[in-house]
Amino acid sequence: MGFGLRWILLVAGYVADFEGAKGYVARPSPLVLPMLSIGALWLILWQGRLRNFGPIMMAASFMIWASDDRPLVLIAENGSLLGVMTDQGRALSKEKGAGFVARNWLENDGDPSLQSVTASLWGTGMKGMKVAQVGAYEFVHLIGKKAVFEFDRCQSDQIVIASVETQRDFGNCTVHDPKTLRNSGSIGLYLQGDEAVFITARDISGDRIWSAWPSKQPSK
């Protein structure tokens, strides 16, 4: 048995080294894989004409998968990283740091690019501050204490993400920092028509006993 297992691993490692052996696909919605599995089981196990529902269900799951949209904007749960979807892929606000989060985002987008490559897609900004316009909102990522301290413009259409806790009121804009994000978790923005919809990790997981979310969600 040991020889057989070693042979399997050897062949797997050899094939995995081929160029193009590893591919990426965008993460499907939670509905897709159950539909695909049930459809396949229905096709295999059912007898008679009703087994045709199996391929129909499988085809429907692939159609849903193809039409799924990834979030236009992703905010890391501690404010350390911001990702904005562009025509060339997701632009990340940092070329290094928060590597685990960056890798998960890119893999779920179906993008094999390195973090340093996707960071080069970012448009405007300066050292310590990255700016991106998404719909009616201007997203500002402040990286480090110096950037947070020097930031002095805050407008109602801005959403500011700080990598460190803010110690002052920026004014008439929405601010997310490690303190507020502890109450919401990571945040994703979707566009439904002209309307922006923000979905938090807390919205998805719910307030369960084991989730350990704070009892209230303070806002700034």
Predicted ranges, named:
Residues 1-79, 83-87:
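Transmembrane helix-bundle segments that form internal channels/tunnels in multi-pass membrane proteins
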Residues 85-220:
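Extracytosolic and intramembrane catalytic regions of membrane-associated proteins
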